[in-house]
Amino acid sequence: MEELIHLAYAIDTFYFLICGVLVMWMAAGFSMLEAGLVRSKNTAEILTKNIALFAIACTMYLFLGYYIMYSSPEGGFLPNLGFLIGEENTMDAVLSGGEDAPYYSMRSDYFFQVVFVATAMSIVSGAVAERMKLWAFLAFAVVLTGVIYPVSGYWTWGEGWLDAAGFSDFAGSGIVHMAGASAALAGVLVLGARKGKYGPNGEVHAIPGANMPLATLGTFILWMGWFGFNGGSELKMSDIDSANNVAQVFVNTNAAAAGGVLGALILSKLWFKKADLTMALNGALAGLVAITAEPLEPTGQGAALIGAVGGAIVVASIIFLDKLRLDDPVGAISVHGVVGLWGLLAVPLTNADATFGAQILGAVAIFAWVFIASLVVWLILKAIMGIRVSEEEEYAGVDIAECGLEAYPEFTKGSK
């Protein structure tokens, strides 16, 4: 019997770590997606942001964020602060066999959680692209990953007051994606739109991305990484029930992404009279975000429908935000924020234990906390160091101004 417990512990720990690696691979997906959707003169800077934010997220969560997010007391509003991850699980604790016996390594839990933090910050990167100062962005990343995200994470996954209120978010439609979009929205409001994006009479000028093949590759990488994002949130797979659950989560994750693509393509055809690749890519991501709140309970067909609704929502949301003159170069606020809200509200449709009241409460609480806290931080950064590059630097491209190099030097010389 002891040998079986040892084996189950090893399997669950290894599964957790592999899923964490898949989620880390999503950082490459975000990098490629954003690099493809910005103009060539801004590519090196956005790639720099993505690798730097990942390093900052890993560091801040290691030294501070993890201890805020997983602190006592249960059901509380304000977290306590510890200073050590603590001793690893002992053999006696694992072999005790009780309901509370640990079944995976604490270090694997930390590793899985830290890559989620980086995902939340990656969402901000694309929304403020092409006009934000690099170091202002990185300073904000320190605060979001070290404090803002962990506090709302404590309320939910850390068994705080939202968890006690019955809020349900399996893998993070709200906790990760809507939180990242809320921080992005605050940044966009303080930062303003790119030069030339909107005309004086309400015109919206398209600013195409430089490399759609790269953006498409990034989307497929994210699609792949999402299997770890949702599948790992089952937390184990060493018994029959959990293994079956993981398989269902994988099926539903894939079905929702496919539904999102079709929903976005069909609405784009009806609305614009053409198939829009950018909308299709965002539709895939929207389907993935939508199912993330509850990827286990729906049938595969139900997951496809949830994803299709998300794909349609993202098309309408991107157009609507442009009408409001909220400039989001990659559609991150729509994909992760608006569709993240849809994902939370869809949970009670398939999960009998969830309620619309608790889901709405959780959505409002997460948005209010992250948006207000982020807005304060953005305003402080604006006052202290400025957050926007000069007009000349924006027209020339932030690659040279912020990084001193270009991603495509043969093609961007003198480009405006």
Report the location of each language-model feature.
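Hydrophobic alpha-helical transmembrane bundles of multi-pass membrane proteins
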Residues: M1-K416
